[in-house]
Amino acid sequence: ILTAILPIAVSKCSERSFAKPTVSTSDTPEKPKDSGEILCALTAGLYKNSYSAETLKAIAILMNTNYRANPDSFKANDFLYEENASGSIKDVYGEIKKAAESAKNKTLRKNSEALFVPYSETSNGTTYKNENYKYIHSVASPWDCYQTDFDANAECVGVSLSGIDYLCKNGYSAEEALLWYLPDFEIADD
C-alpha cells in the first residue's frame, strides 16, 4: 500500500518549500551528570512541541546510540538539562525523562556495533547516502513534505526527525519508525 502512495506524496513534496526554524538550547551545567541525565538532556535538546511521546522515545534511542558511539561529537548547546529548561519544555520535561528512561538501555546496532547515526529535522522526501556514513542507505521519506518546515532542498543523511514523528503519530512504534530509516540495523537492549 505504501508504494502506491509514494508517487502522490513525492509530487506533493515538490510543490511546497518552507524555511527551517532554529532550535536553541542551554549550556551544560557545571557539575557532572549521570548517563540518564545526559540522555534526557540530549533528548530535550531536540524537543519540539508537536512531537508525540513515541517520537521522544525514538529520539532518545537515537541520542543514546550516538552518545555511546561518539560522545565527543556533541557540543554544549546540544544538551538541555532540566535546571536550564524554560517555558513549554520545562512543562513537559517529565515526559522527556520518561522517554529517556525507556530508552536508556536501547541502542541502534549494525552487525552488533553501535554506530553514529546522522539525522536532520526533515528531508526533501528521500534520505541520502554519504561517503562519511557508508553504513547508511537512502530511503524514501515522503511524509516530510507534510511538515510546516519542509525544505525541498534539504539533504538528509540517516534519519529524518519529522519523518520519525509522522510515522509514530500514524501507528509505528519508536523502534519501527527508526528501523524504517535504518533497515540494516537492529535495536539492541544493552
Language model regions located:
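Conserved, single-site charged/polar hotspot
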Residues: I1-D190
